[in-house]
Amino acid sequence: MQILDGKKLSQKIKESIKKEVEELKKEQDIIPGLAVILVGDDPASHTYVKMKARACKDVGIYSIVHEMPESISQKEIEETISMMNKNPNIDGILVQLPLPKHIDTTKILELIDPAKDVDGFHPYNFGRLMQGLDTFAPCTPLGVMELLDEYGIDVKGMNACVVGASNIVGKPMAALLLNRFATVDICHIYTKDLAEHTKKADIIAVGVGKPNLITADMVKERAIVIDIGINKVGNKIVGDVDFENVSKKASYITPVPGGVGPMTIAMLLKNTIKAAKQRKRS
């Protein structure tokens, strides 16, 4: 069994991005810029945004956080996005989810200029992803693919099982695997017999937020197991996979923490650089 070390790879990617940012500044006078919209007082959201801002600072990307109260109106968020769309110093716009219940999240995400949609949530970019075209892909599944590439894992011809069908992780994860010619099975809350699907899989990617959902008896020998789940159990952060027992059967597995999580932020930085380069070309 080999650990897919996202922490180590994310550091390597950040070092490469830092050099790229320095070259962009020196040769083309471009400073990539990221705007983050943060609504409400959710502690987890505030933690994630701080981590993203710190990562930007570490590599030389300019970032600005627009903090808004929980009571903010739909119109006020829309106006802020419109302003960021027009701002020539901003290459990427990120809305930290979840938004308060009175806000129409779909409408908010659709307002972001697709050329600045570094989270890859806009329907335009999602459509391009489904067609296998170059686009911004959501950062978490993109990070998974980068991790597989780093360890020389080619998914072509593999049976893949994606557990979870969210727009943020499950669906784009399935699309990215399909674009690499894996045969993809998508499971969700209404899947009748989850084990029936996971047992056939050469690669399992799970992200639903349920500790120990995937147990050793649900995984075939030498399977590749990608744990995208993040759950707090007591004082520990764990994934959706029973790591201790599944790791005895898997050929490769991601730990939680230190697997997919660090890759998500690394891909956000990568997408922001991509947006900055495209802005320069256009």
UniProtKB/Swiss-Prot annotation:
Catalyzes the oxidation of 5,10-methylenetetrahydrofolate to 5,10-methenyltetrahydrofolate and then the hydrolysis of 5,10-methenyltetrahydrofolate to 10-formyltetrahydrofolate. InterPro entries: Aminoacid_DH-like_N_sf (IPR046346), NAD(P)-bd_dom_sf (IPR036291), THF_DH/CycHdrlase (IPR000672), THF_DH/CycHdrlase_cat_dom (IPR020630), THF_DH/CycHdrlase_CS (IPR020867), THF_DH/CycHdrlase_NAD-bd_dom (IPR020631). Homodimer. Its EC number is 1.5.1.5, 3.5.4.9. One of its GO terms (biological process) is tetrahydrofolate interconversion. The keyword Oxidoreductase applies. Pfam families: THF_DHG_CYH, THF_DHG_CYH_C. HAMAP family: THF_DHG_CYH. Belongs to the tetrahydrofolate dehydrogenase/cyclohydrolase family. This is Bifunctional protein FolD. Keywords: Amino-acid biosynthesis, Histidine biosynthesis, Hydrolase, Methionine biosynthesis, Multifunctional enzyme, NADP, One-carbon metabolism, Oxidoreductase, Purine biosynthesis. GO terms for cellular component: cytosol. It catalyses: (6R)-5,10-methylene-5,6,7,8-tetrahydrofolate + NADP(+) = (6R)-5,10-methenyltetrahydrofolate + NADPH; (6R)-5,10-methenyltetrahydrofolate + H2O = (6R)-10-formyltetrahydrofolate + H(+). The keyword Ribosomal protein does not apply. One of its GO terms (molecular function) is methenyltetrahydrofolate cyclohydrolase activity. NADP(+) binds at G164, A165, S166, I189, I230. Pathway: One-carbon metabolism; tetrahydrofolate interconversion.
